Amino acid sequence: MTLWPKRPIIYEINTRVWLNELTRKHQRPIELSCVPAGEWDAIAAWGFDAVWLMGVWERSLIGQHIARTTQGYLDDYRRALPDYTLDDVAGSPYCVHRYVVDAHFGGTRGLAAARSELAQRGLKLLLDFVPNHVAPDHPWVINHPEYFVQGSRDDLSRAPNDYFDTYGGHILARGRDPYFPPWPDVAQLNAFNPALRSAAIDTLNVIADQCDGVRCDMAMLMLNDVFDRTWSNRAGTRPNVEYWREVIPAVRGR
């Protein structure tokens, strides 16, 4: 593979939607390992430098339940797609249960096959990383609650939309942008926690082994100034080094 151009042209594909469309088009189940060669050829013919397969990671069942039962979301679906059904609602691709390729898409082997097809056509592969939050059923919630912004019983009583009970002895904050209400389907990671930063590096190394570049969702939320403004005294001691200045070199230099 050649080096990245200075200003790459990237084609985003909603992986779930695309595979469903191909399944209907070809009238057989299509996952990443068996996308017809002509489909890859058509993408390559457009002259892009890379393909971003958005949303390949395992989605959360809790997140899916929230997406299927929150009235405001249901109203939005109906306005956008009057004929939608609940089977169409898979949950947010940014509510990541685990950084494992979803079995519905062909799993790790399917992704490797897709990457190979792209490489044969001179295209690079981008995948997602969500540094700010994970799903409420991500293994870290139970195994490493210290990675998250913590709350108290009083916080939960005062602001039940801002916090949730893990039922493992911890109250955690829901993920958020400082200018909007919290997202109901994710848990807020603590960018100031050294152990979380180390775990993020490990996660990124796993992702990097499977692609040529990473698209980092809501990357600005991990900046010290932004995180401090959002979480102030709940985040602990502000580090001297920015999150990305610690994480990116560690992944690039491995």
Feature locations, PLM:
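Active-site and adjacent substrate-binding regions of carbohydrate-active enzymes
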Residues: 1-254
